[in-house]
A protein has these predicted regions:
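Extended, charged catalytic domains and RNA/DNA-binding interfaces, predominantly
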Residues: 1-309
Length: 309
C-alpha cells in the first residue's frame, strides 16, 4: 500500500498492474479495526483453532485467482459469524469483563490482534519521511446503525451467558446504515489496540475513548466517510439513544470529528439532487445504495452540505 502511494506499481488481484498518475504527499492505511489480524491467523492451517478450516491457505498463490473470487467473498460474509459461533463460559466471562465482545469467541486471539496492530504502527513509522511523504497511524472504525438490543447495556450479560451467541450484526429498524470512521493518530503515541465496533457500535463511545486518550497525551481525530450510504443517519438530529442533539453534543462531536470525507470511489457525499434541486451538479457520482447492499439509502441526514447548513 505504501509503495503504491509513493508511485510504485502493484499487482491487482485479477492480475493487471496498477499505478497512480502522481505519487501522494501523505497517506494513512485504514484497515478495518475489528478482528484485525484474525484472517491471516485463521488462514494458517497449523493454527489449531477448530472452525477455521474454510479459511486455511486462503491467501496462498493458488487461491488468489479470478475463479476463487466468489468463494472468498462468501468467506468474508462469515467473518463476524465466526466470532458469534464459537464460545465457552470462560471466553464469555472475559468478553463481559473487558467489554470486548470479540473475546467471547474461542477463535479470537488478543495477542494476534495486538501484534497485527503493532505491525500497522511500525509500517507507518517505517515509511514516514517528513517533508516528502508523511504517514499517519490509522484504522477504520467500522460501525453501522444496525444496533443490536442484545449486545448493548445490561442485556449483554444475558446474551454472553446464554451460550447461543450474540447478534453482533444488529437488527431492524436501523437497517445497516454505514457509520464508518477513519481514526487517525497524531504524533508518536499510540494505543495497544484500536477501539472497534466489537467494543461498542455507538460512535459516541468512540468519542469518549478519544477524549480519554487526549487527556493522557494520545491525540486522535475521527473522519466520517461514505455518509451517503448511512441511510440518513450519519448527520441525523438525534443522538444514539434517540434524544434530540444539543450544543453539548455538537461540541463533543466537533472535538473528535473536525473533518468529514465528501467524495470517494463509492460515491459523493457532498449533496444529492433531492437536497439541492437547483444545483445542476448535484447528481455528480451519486450512489443511492447503502454500502455493501442494494437497499436504498435515504438522502436526508446523509450528505455534508445539508449537515453544515
Amino acid at each position: 500500500a505504501y509503495d503504491f502511494a509513493k508511485g510504485g506499481s502493484i499487482k491487482h488481484a485479477l492480475g493487471y498492474d496498477m499505478k497512480l498518475r502522481e505519487p501522494l504527499d501523505f497517506y494513512a492505511v485504514t484497515d478495518h479495526g475489528f478482528l484485525l489480524g484474525s484472517i491471516p491467523d485463521w488462514a494458517d492451517p497449523n493454527n489449531g483453532k477448530a472452525g477455521t478450516e474454510p479459511f486455511h491457505n486462503l491467501n496462498s498463490p493458488e487461491n488468489l485467482i479470478q475463479e476463487s473470487v466468489a468463494e472468498r467473498s462468501n468467506l468474508f460474509q462469515s467473518y463476524v459469524r465466526n466470532v458469534n459461533s464459537f464460545s465457552n463460559i470462560w471466553t464469555r466471562l472475559v468478553a463481559y469483563v473487558t467489554g470486548d465482545t470479540a473475546r467471547g469467541s474461542t477463535l479470537y486471539d488478543v495477542d494476534v490482534h495486538r501484534t497485527a496492530w503493532k505491525d500497522v504502527i511500525q509500517s507507518a513509522q517505517r515509511h514516514n519521511d517528513p517533508g516528502n511523504f508523511t504517514t499517519f497511524v490509522a484504522y477504520e472504525y467500522t460501525t453501522s446503525s444496525a444496533r443490536s438490543s442484545n449486545t448493548e447495556g445490561s442485556s449483554a450479560l444475558k446474551c454472553l451467558f446464554n451460550g447461543t451467541g450474540c447478534n453482533f450484526a444488529g437488527s431492524p429498524p436501523h437497517e445497516n446504515g454505514n457509520l464508518h470512521r477513519n481514526v487517525i493518530y497524531k504524533g508518536n503515541k499510540f494505543t495497544v489496540e484500536p477501539f472497534t465496533r466489537l467494543k461498542s457500535l455507538n460512535p459516541e463511545d468512540l468519542w469518549s475513548w478519544m477524549d480519554e486518550l487526549r487527556e493522557n497525551g494520545v491525540d486522535t481525530i475521527a473522519i466520517p466517510h461514505n455518509s451517503n450510504g448511512s441511510n440518513g443517519q450519519m448527520f441525523e438530529m438525534e443522538n444514539w439513544d434517540g434524544l434530540p442533539i444539543a450544543s453539548q453534543y455538537a461540541e463533543f462531536r466537533m472535538r473528535n470529528e473536525p473533518l468529514v470525507e465528501m467524495t470517494q470511489v463509492k460515491g459523493t457525499s457532498e449533496t444529492h439532487p433531492i437536497l439541492s434541486p437547483n444545483d445542476e451538479w448535484a447528481d455528480f457520482e451519486i450512489m443511492d445504495q447503502r454500502v455493501g447492499a442494494s437497499t436504498y439509502s435515504r438522502p436526508f441526514g446523509g450528505y455534508v452540505r445539508q449537515a453544515y447548513l
